[in-house]
Amino acid sequence: MAAKQLQFDEEARRSLERGVDTLADTVKVTLGPKGRYVVLDKKWGAPTITNDGVTVAKEVDLTDPYENLGAQLAKEVATKTNDVAGDGTTTATVLAQALVHEGLRAVASGANPVGLKRGIEKAVDAVVEELRSISRAIDTTSDMASVATISSRDETIGALIAEAFDKVGKDGVITVDESQTFGTELDFTEGMQFDKGYLSPYMVTDQDRMEAVIEDPYILIHSGKISSMNDLLPLLEKVIAAHGSLFIVAEDVDGEALSTLVVNKIRGTFSSVAVKAPAFGDRRKAMLQDIATLTGGQVVAPEVGLKLDQVGLEVLGRAKKVVVTKDNTTIVDGAGDKADVEGRVIQLRAEYDNSDSEWDREKLQERIAKLAGGVCVIRVGAATEVELNEKKHRIEDAVSATRAAIEEGIVAGGGSALIHAAHVLDGDLHLEGDEKAGVQIVAKAVREPLRWIAENGGEPGYVIVSKVAEMEPGHGYNGKTGQYVDLIADGVIDPLKVTRSALANAASIASLLLTTETLVVDKPEEDNEDK
């Protein structure tokens, strides 16, 4: 086991703070409509230019091992916020930095970190509850366009994303792809997505995006587990003879069968991707039938008289393309008969109407959306690969932000919602001592996102924060125009989910950092010089 080196007490916390500062200072220049870009060096190919907080954060690793621990904690804030809400990563990082600064100042003054942590948690709960109360549901396509425009910094992209959600609905699937032209356009295709990823990373075809993409595959839908290669081999030979590729949906694919698929993929002999079937029990059977209907195939199962080692190509479904990530599968343009798909949707709607269970109705609604909603592909074009990647980052963030807004509603944007929601902390939540100090830490920290939106636009941040704090909720500073306006009427809105996730995740990591007393890292190996 490698030797370790340690840091303790104040020295340890200051190292963590320096690491958080380094990462946050790198990320926060991107905040707001006038935020700047960060250029990321790549070992191969052109550099990446982006204003996406989590993309920048993932690239930061520091040489000092203690400071690097702080940077990695701050990175976790951005990553977690991106996973939950898909946007707001820069805001989350700025909030984490502010909470750490104010918290460590309080600890240095003699406050107990555990008491501060409790106060911070209670304050965040109160602010999130207030955010929920001042939020409103998204009502119109123009609201969706406003959210997407704020996130992408582009009105044309905002309108395109709003149109995409209009087509597929809130449960529909929207993906971002490359275009062969310079423009950005919308392509609506019927399709289905479910939350199961590839069974082996060796199946990946696009290493940059960690996706397995197969064109025009045969689709095997199997109700059981596939372990033996002897069962799969007869069908595999028929697919290879037809010069096709194979996509497998089954309860599981493991053992000899999985190994053979992977080896053939690595050798370039035969292209295949396997995923586990979505859901469990009766709902899994129903969803396999949905996939079969969409792709024009049949579910291979003993109860319907179909055995894997005896079936031919006629029971396999087809699709134009299947895209599989580590978490999700998207089937695009299934070859099933439209009348059969419509009949299946009508059947599901009847089940929905007759169901008394809220949970069953919710799951049926999801299945209807997956069958009827389809897939919208936003095709992105640009003059160079660098510009293309930057544009794709912005559009992917904007799609996530719009979906978050549809799910939980919107609040006034530009950092003002946090400031106005924090008025609930004016009485310190009737807490005392260190918990009261924790509340005051949150009250100060929530001002930082607006401050940096203003600073990045060349305006005095503290002055603007003070003015906005005195305005009524819903009003604030428009960083793009430099005016004080009714933000919602002006289309400056943020998804509630993004705002609350940013605050909650920042507070979670900052609280842990404040209560840290010891750092343990690997001792660097000393170079042995020849004497």
Swiss-Prot record:
Coiled coil: none annotated. SUPFAM superfamilies: GroEL apical domain-like (SSF52029), GroEL equatorial domain-like (SSF48592), GroEL-intermediate domain like (SSF54849). InterPro entries: Chaperonin_Cpn60_CS, Cpn60/GroEL, Cpn60/GroEL/TCP-1, GroEL-like_apical_dom_sf, GROEL-like_equatorial_sf, TCP-1-like_intermed_sf. The keyword ATP-binding applies. Its main location: cytoplasm. GO terms for biological process: protein refolding. It catalyses: ATP + H2O + a folded polypeptide = ADP + phosphate + an unfolded polypeptide. One of its GO terms (molecular function) is isomerase activity. It comes from the Bacteria. It is found in: Cytoplasm. HAMAP family: CH60. Belongs to the chaperonin (HSP60) family. Forms a cylinder of 14 subunits composed of two heptameric rings stacked back-to-back. Interacts with the co-chaperonin GroES. This is Chaperonin GroEL 2.
